[in-house]
C-alpha cells in the first residue's frame, strides 16, 4: 500500500510537538489550520461567555444555551433545556444530536472523542495514540441527570432518563432509566394504562 505524502503544514505541526492524527490532518493546509484556530476561539468564547454568563442570566437559558450550541455546530431540537455549566466537545460539535424536549441538566459533559486504546501496549506512549470519534444522539424527551458524562458513540433512546453522576459508555434504550458508572439500565418505564383517568 502506497503511503500518502504528508503536507508541509502537518509536518510543521508535528515538529512543534502537536499530536494530530495522520488520517484526519495529514493533508491539512495552512488555510484550514487558520480557519480551525479561529473557529476554536470563537466557539470557546461563545461557550465561556454566553453559556454561563451572569450578565446574560436574565435571558432565558431555554433560548440562549440551545442557540449557542447550534452556533458551534450541534444539532439541537425544539424546546431543549441546557443547564448551567454543561460542557460539549466543541472541536467535534457537529457530532452531537439533541432531540426535541430533551433536558441536559447542570454540569453534564458531552464528549465525542477519546483515545483509541485498541493498539495500546506496554511501553507505548498513551499521548501519541490516535483519537476515536463517535456521534452522540440524545433522543426526544430524554433527561440527563446532573454531572453525567456521555462518551463517544452513544445513543440515548427517546424518553430515557440518565441518573445524576452517571458515565454513559453504551447505548441506553428508549423509555428506560439508567444510572451508575458505567450506566446500566435499572428500570423500564411502563406504558400508561388507558383506563386510568
Identify the meaning behind each predicted range.
Residues 59, 81-82:
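Conserved short histidine dyad/triad with adjacent acidic residue
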Residues 78-79, 100, 140, 158-159, ...:
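Short acidic capping loops at alpha-helix termini that bridge into adjacent secondary structure
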Residues 94, 166, 174-176, 184:
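Glycine-centered loop/turn positions within well-structured domains
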Residues 143, 161, 177-179:
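Short-chain dehydrogenase/reductase
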Residues 1-72, 114-118, 141, 181-197:
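Terminal amphipathic alpha-helical/low-complexity segments used for targeting or macromolecular assembly
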Residues 65-67, 84-155, 181-182, 187-196:
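Flexible, glycine/small-residue-enriched loop-and-beta-strand segment within the central core
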Residues 54, 72, 76, 96, ...:
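Sequence/structural signature of small/polar-enriched beta-strand/turn repeats
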